[in-house]
């Protein structure tokens, strides 16, 4: 059947990348189709039941600032919230939400089903319709042809997915779901640069068989933080504890004894696993000097006894899993509900993409999520939103948009993938961002919501809330600038009495806030401030880090000169005199769009960038005189 409706955007896959891609395109007014092999698994948390964490929550806040769904779903489904790095600087603080899988998934599905311009259809995609070098649509498993101006592929671990438990293997996109074989073969036919990656998950445990009394409880923060700029604590369901236990020498001996049947250590799995989320087999091998490793028992939800033992991801045979679980303190009688497993899947070298996440080889075809070599819900959601918005803009022949490294962690993510490529699952960290003081979790809305509004991603309700917040920040900052404390006036005396600090000369309340040991709560009490915690936090960080932030702005201004020098798409690196063969090949492979991007390619020297710049200028002058 040839479906009668022509879509602007078709999104294949209903995971974290696919849902954000479909929602973004539909919010922008494009006729959008979301194809999923199973409507019941939309927004499924395939691995750990958590959103956020170091570097990751910055991405979640950016998705949220652009109108995305992930943060609000985390607030509606979060059963424990914590601020990580709370004693460190503002740049590296991160919110983490332990999520109820069912509630989170329900929140995502509700958002999808109530989104205007979005159709959902349950059917696996088997083929892409490609005419010449342009995608024209999708063919489903049943042979239904859907036509579209653009297509976004968000296939997760489903492309050629193989599940491993010990030396046993089976085809699957994740436990209980079939893989995407026909589509994987079709993509290989298109000569896109394909590789294999691997990820894994731990066995799930029945909480009724665990002795929590010998474990360390890990409560959430109080008052509970929220994930979304539109979130409220009243959205949160009941809050619960996680628990901490540890592996031991017996556990490690059991694991070592099973390595001869491990698919990772016998060469059965060829795909590379995530460096920063290693399996328990990897941990005892790489960190053989350690006597134990932490295990976090995380509830999967309020209406289930299922626990996620974070820290013991494994693909060892089930009999070994059974023994290793029962060797851990408090889990001596543990019942395993689901075995752990590893999954191997196809991914495509992200250097074959443009910075808009469109493939260089096929016009109108976009990739987002694990297909690009990343790991994590947050990384997937960020790519999905960007791919969805750019597919939407291309469909209407509008200029596409990707944030720069100084604008967003999304920009860092995309720039790293396209410029550097990846041979192992890529995870976001704050350390990857050179301008992290400007790219804080708390100011994602200041950085992106105005842009999102211009792009059509941000609705009236979110825009009004953002404008109200920014007006409150401006009003309160102005008020504090005009309140003065002096050694002999009432405000000055109250300040000294409250804080025990010295006050030798007259200064404004803003100047008092600049002091290292003074926080906004104290200034609010001193001056009778009634603004929200969010507004107070914004003011405090802006005041305390003003000098550092200004220096980063100066660095950005210098970089912009390189960013503004575009490299023509048809630029011939072979004619650049003095460029080594190795550097020429690297530049031809990546085809950077600006001199700044060229400078970030490993092995491309400042001298090489200078040679390219000189050649571009010569070419431009030749064109002018011609």
Swiss-Prot record:
Alphabetized Pfam families for the sequence: GIDA, GIDA_C_1st, SAM_GIDA_C
**Which residue windows are transmembrane per the record?**
none
Identify the PROSITE patterns for this entry: GIDA_1, GIDA_2
One BP annotation, GO: tRNA wobble uridine modification
Its keywords, alphabetically, are: Cytoplasm, FAD, Flavoprotein, NAD, tRNA processing
Q: Which cofactor does it need?
A: FAD
Question: Which SMART domains does the record cross-reference, listed alphabetically?
Answer: GIDA_assoc_3
At the top level, the lineage of the source is Bacteria
GO cellular component term of the entry, any: cytosol
Q: What GO molecular function annotation could you give as one example from this UniProt entry? A: flavin adenine dinucleotide binding
Q: Does the keyword DNA damage apply?
A: no
* Binding residues annotated for FAD, in chain numbering: 13-18
Binding positions (NAD(+)):
273-287
Q: Where in the cell is it found?
A: Cytoplasm
Q: Main role?
A: NAD-binding protein involved in the addition of a carboxymethylaminomethyl (cmnm) group at the wobble position (U34) of certain tRNAs, forming tRNA-cmnm(5)s(2)U34.
Give the family this protein belongs to, as stated in its UniProt record.
Belongs to the MnmG family.
Quote the subunit structure annotation.
Homodimer. Heterotetramer of two MnmE and two MnmG subunits.
Kindly provide the name given to this protein in its UniProt entry: tRNA uridine 5-carboxymethylaminomethyl modification enzyme MnmG
**What species is this protein from?**
Acinetobacter baumannii (strain ACICU)
The organism's lineage is: Bacteria, Pseudomonadati, Pseudomonadota, Gammaproteobacteria, Moraxellales
Q: Which gene name does the record give?
A: mnmG
């Amino acid at each position: 059947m040839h479906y009668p409706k022509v879509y602007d955007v078709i999104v294949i896959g209903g995971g974290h990348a696919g849902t954000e891609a479909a929602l973004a395109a539909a919010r922008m007014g494009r006729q959008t189709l979301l194809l999923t092999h199973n409507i019941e698994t939309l927004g499924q948390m395939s691995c750990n039941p958590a959103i956020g964490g170091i570097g990751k929550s910055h991405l979640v806040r950016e998705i949220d600032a652009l109108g995305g769904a992930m943060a609000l779903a985390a607030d509606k489904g979060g059963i424990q919230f914590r601020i990580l790095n709370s004693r460190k600087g503002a740049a590296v603080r991160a919110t983490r939400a332990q999520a109820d899988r069912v509630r989170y998934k329900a929140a995502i599905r509700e958002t999808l089903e109530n989104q205007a311009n979005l159709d959902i259809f349950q059917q696996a995609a088997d083929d892409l319709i490609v005419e010449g070098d342009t995608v024209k649509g999708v063919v489903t498993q049943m042979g239904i042809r859907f036509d579209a101006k653009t297509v976004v592929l968000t296939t997760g671990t489903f492309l050629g997915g193989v599940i491993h438990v010990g030396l046993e293997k089976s085809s699957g996109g994740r436990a209980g779901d079939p893989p995407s074989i026909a589509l994987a073969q079709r993509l290989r036919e298109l000569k896109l640069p394909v590789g294999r990656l691997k990820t894994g998950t731990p066995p799930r445990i029945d909480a009724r068989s665990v002795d929590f009394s010998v474990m360390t409880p890990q409560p959430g923060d109080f008052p509970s933080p929220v994930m979304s700029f539109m979130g409220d604590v009243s959205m949160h369901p009941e809050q619960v504890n996680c628990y901490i236990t540890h592996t031991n020498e017996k556990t490690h001996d059991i694991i070592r004894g099973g390595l001869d049947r491990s698919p990772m250590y016998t060469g059965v799995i060829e795909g590379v696993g995530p460096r920063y989320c290693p399996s328990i087999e990897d941990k005892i091998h790489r960190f053989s000097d350690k006597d134990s490793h932490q295990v976090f028992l995380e509830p999967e939800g309020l209406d289930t006894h299922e626990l996620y033992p974070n820290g013991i991801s494994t693909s060892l045979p089930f009999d070994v899993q059974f023994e290793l679980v029962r060797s851990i303190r408090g889990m001596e009688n543990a019942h395993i509900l689901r075995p752990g497993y590893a999954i191997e899947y196809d991914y495509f070298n992200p250097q074959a993409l443009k910075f808009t996440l469109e493939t260089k080889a096929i016009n109108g075809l976009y990739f987002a999520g694990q297909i690009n070599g990343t790991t994590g819900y947050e990384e997937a959601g960020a790519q999905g939103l960007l791919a969805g918005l750019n597919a939407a803009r291309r469909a209407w022949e509008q200029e596409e948009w990707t944030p720069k490294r100084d604008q967003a962690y999304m920009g860092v993510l995309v720039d790293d993938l396209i410029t550097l490529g990846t041979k192992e699952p890529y995870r976001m960290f704050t350390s990857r961002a050179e301008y992290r003081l400007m790219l804080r979790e708390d100011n994602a809305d200041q950085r992106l919501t105005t842009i999102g509004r211009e792009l059509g991603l941000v609705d009236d309700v979110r825009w009004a809330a953002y404008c109200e917040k920014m007006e409150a920040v401006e009003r309160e900052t102005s008020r504090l600038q005009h309140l003065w404390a002096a050694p002999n006036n009432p405000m000055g005396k109250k300040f000294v009495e409250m804080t025990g600090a010295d006050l030798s000369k007259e200064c404004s309340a803003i100047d008092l806030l600049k002091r290292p040991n003074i926080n906004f709560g104290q200034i609010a009490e001193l001056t009778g401030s009634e603004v929200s915690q969010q507004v107070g936090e914004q003011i405090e960080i802006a005041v305390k880090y003003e000098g550092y932030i200004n220096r980063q702005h100066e660095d950005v201004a210098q970089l912009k000169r390189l960013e503004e020098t575009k490299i023509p798409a048809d630029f011939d690196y072979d004619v650049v005199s003095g460029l080594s063969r190795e550097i020429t090949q690297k530049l031809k492979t990546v085809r950077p769009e600006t001199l700044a991007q060229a400078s970030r390619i490993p092995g491309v020297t400042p001298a090489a960038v200078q040679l390219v710049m000189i050649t571009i200028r010569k070419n431009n002058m030749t064109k002018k005189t011609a």
